[in-house]
A protein has these predicted regions:
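Conserved acidic residues
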Residues: 36, 57, 96
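A short acidic, Gly/Pro-enriched loop at the edge of an enzyme's catalytic core
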Residues: 88-98
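Conserved class I S-adenosyl-L-methionine
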Residues: 1-33
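A short beta-strand submotif of the Rossmann-like class I SAM-dependent methyltransferase core
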Residues: 100-101, 109
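Conserved Class I S-adenosyl-L-methionine
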Residues: 165-247
């Protein structure tokens, strides 16, 4: 879309700021019995995979998108990457940890969980995690909630809006001995413009613009945000919702 060309640098900058916090990877490392090997499924361009490198002797990543894996290989040459759907992924080794960042809900979750019988070592840990819907504190909160309810909501994928039954599926898989849902606090400070840019970079706002709002909606949203909030920075809640399961 044209707005991505017009605001490309800003989109990339804000996505770079909304990174997974260290506590995610520290929590993963604290729960695994060993640090020999980790696998990141649905790894995209490797931005979540490389965070595992300081914690494990060997790190591997997989994604079904060949172009994403090409980018990951160029950016992180010290990591082994493979092109494959997570449901079909095979490796020559077993892993102490298998992780999945903001991608598990797009997969056949039951098939992936069954796959953990072969990918995980005995007592190995599977962790799927994702951002919650961001909440901007202050006057922008009401504004973005209105935009969501009146314009964006119908364009969100149902997998993002319905109850997340991952924990129940983990228990039903009979692969794991224990499992729990863990919420990790994650507050990020962004400028009001960066908050708007984050939403404009999401799939649901992009779909709204394609189908209803038009390309001019980006500038309109930025203008309204500037009128509503003149503070230099805004605290935004990007809490991480994670599921841990141990074999």
């Amino acid at each position: 879309m044209k707005q991505f060309d017009k605001h490309a640098d800003a989109y990339h900058a804000v996505r770079g700021k909304v990174a997974y916090p260290d506590v995610v990877f520290e929590t993963i490392a604290s729960r695994v019995p060993g640090r020999e090997a980790a696998l990141d499924i649905g790894c995209g361009n490797g931005v979540s995979t490389y965070r595992l490198q300081p914690l494990f002797d060997y790190v591997e990543g997989s994604d079904f998108g060949a172009s994403l894996i090409d980018k990951a290989r160029q950016t992180y040459p010290g990591i082994t990457f493979g092109v494959s759907p997570a449901e079909d992924y095979t490796s020559t080794r077993q892993f102490d940890a298998v992780t999945c960042a903001t991608a598990f809900y797009w997969m056949d979750r039951d098939a992936v969980l069954r796959k953990m019988e072969t990918l995980l070592k005995p007592s190995g840990v599977f962790c799927a995690y994702k951002y919650d819907f961001p909440i901007a504190y202050g006057p922008l909160r009401d504004f973005f909630e209105r935009e969501l309810s009146l314009k964006w909501y119908v364009h969100r994928d149902p997998r993002l809006t319905r109850y997340d039954d991952t924990l129940e599926r983990i228990h039903a898989s009979k692969v794991f001995g224990e499992a729990e849902r863990v919420v990790l606090s994650n507050i990020i400070e962004l400028t009001p413009r960066e908050v708007a840019m984050f939403f404009l970079s999401t799939s649901y706002v992009t779909k709204y613009m394609d189908q209803a709002g038009g390309a001019e909606y980006a500038d309109e949203l930025l203008r309204k945000v500037a009128e509503i909030e003149n503070a230099p920075s805004v605290k935004v809640n990007f809490d991480i919702h994670s599921f841990f399961a141990k074999r």
